[in-house]
C-alpha cells in the first residue's frame, strides 16, 4: 500500500503544478486582453470571451497574440486530467475505498487529493492531527487560518489543503446523504446558538463541522480497513 500512497502523492503534486500553471496562463491571457483594451476591465472581459467567436473589433489580433498561450493551456489541461484519472484509479485500490464509495459526494479523486496532501492516514495518532493537516483545527481557541509572524508556524495553515476540504464539502451538500443531513442538522443548531449571526456564518460553521466529521470517520475507516487487510493477509499466508 505504501507504493500506492507514494504514487498518489506524486500524481497529486503534478496535478497541482499543472493546475496552477493553467490558472497563471489564463490570467496572463486576460492581462493581454486588458492591455489591448487600455485597462478597461469590462471591455477586456468581452474581448476574452470573443477569442473564439472573434465577435470583437480586436479579437482577431488578440486571438493570434495569445494562441501559443492557449495551446499551452490546453496541453496542461490534458495532462492534469490524466493525473486525475490515474490518481482516482489508484485511490480505488486503497482498502479504505470500500468505505469511501458509500459516501455520497466523495469520489476517488477527492480521496486521492486528501491522501495526496495527508499521506498515510495511519500515521496520524488521532483525528485532530489530520484536521490540522487539512486546515480544520482549532489553534488557541480560534479556527486554524492564515496568519503572519511566529503564529504562522503554529497554525501550519495551507490554503490549498483547506480548499480541498471546502470543495469536498460543497459536493457533499449538493449530493445529499448522511453527511449532507448532518450539515443541515448542524446548521439548525448554529442558527439557534447564534441568532444574531448571518446565513453565511451559520452555513460556514455547519459545513466546517461536517467536514471535520468526515475526516474523523475517514481516519477511523482507514484504521479499520487496513487492520482487516493485514489480518486477511496473515490468514492467506
Predicted regions: what is each one?
Residues 18, 165, 214:
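A residue-level signal for conserved active-site and pocket-lining positions in enzyme catalytic cores
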Residues 100-104:
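Transmembrane alpha-helical segments and their cytosolic interface motifs
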Residues 197-232:
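Basic, amphipathic alpha-helical segments enriched in Lys/Arg and hydrophobic/aromatic residues
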Residues 1-91:
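Long, charge-rich intrinsically disordered scaffolds of nucleic-acid metabolism proteins
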Residues 5, 112-113:
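Short, hydrophobic alpha-helix immediately C-terminal to the catalytic nucleophile
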Residues 99, 113-203, 221:
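Phosphate-backbone recognition surface of nucleic-acid-processing proteins
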Residues 89, 96-97:
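Glycine-rich phosphate/ribose-binding loops and adjacent secondary-structure elements
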